[in-house]
């Protein structure tokens, strides 16, 4: 491929990806509509009733019923469309350090002093005093060293409402929650998905993040501050393409 064509394709791809952002210059970032999400779908679409469910028998002389609306009923989320609170309290720290060093050297020599008189004949043909007695001499040496360190300290405390989007056959609940907050020209987005057991939900209808299986927690944003922290398209392309 011609180098000019390659450079033109790179600039064309960068220009196309930037067109969408140019349309929002001078405007505050829009919030996404929850109408198309799985949470609203789970709240509005009635699930197919399970044939194994047996309606509870109401005692005629009893003052209390066993339903969720009763005074002593279990109001924890358990059905599709129910809402529960996810408590996220992350306080992690990690520190790793490692170093490595490698060194290697080698030397090879080879010469032909006598071989049926052939070396003497060849020496007469070589220029600048060359001789087969010192025909080959190789020296090699290599050395590499590396050192790395990782230090992380992360703290995140959030609470978000999530919706049960699916009840699996083994009783495990699939939850999904999202939250968007716009402050000036910056939108903060929080997404939570995962699987929980009904017995892990507290009496306050809340569950901690470390009890969510296959948890996917995303906390980010979009807006002017996020754009300022992100490298330019040209820099990202150069970091990906350039081998040095």
Curated annotation (Swiss-Prot):
Chain residues carrying a lipid of type S-diacylglycerol cysteine: 19
Paired cysteines (S-S): none
Keyword GTP-binding included in the entry's annotation: no
Compartments it resides in: Cell outer membrane; Bacterial flagellum basal body
The keyword Membrane belongs to this UniProt entry's keyword annotation: yes
Organism: Jannaschia sp. (strain CCS1)
Biological processes annotated in GO: bacterial-type flagellum-dependent cell motility
Keywords linked to the UniProt accession: Bacterial flagellum, Cell outer membrane, Lipoprotein, Membrane, Palmitate, Signal
Main location group: membrane
MF annotations from Gene Ontology: cytoskeletal motor activity
Pfam families: FlgH (PF02107)
Record text on subunit structure and interactions: The basal body constitutes a major portion of the flagellar organelle and consists of four rings (L,P,S, and M) mounted on a central rod.
A GO term from the CC aspect: bacterial-type flagellum basal body, distal rod, L ring
Residues with a covalently attached lipid (N-palmitoyl cysteine): 19
Protein name: Flagellar L-ring protein
Membrane topology listed for this record: Lipid-anchor
Stretch forming the signal peptide: 1-18
Function description: Assembles around the rod to form the L-ring and probably protects the motor/basal body from shearing forces during rotation.
Entry's family note: Belongs to the FlgH family.
Gene: flgH
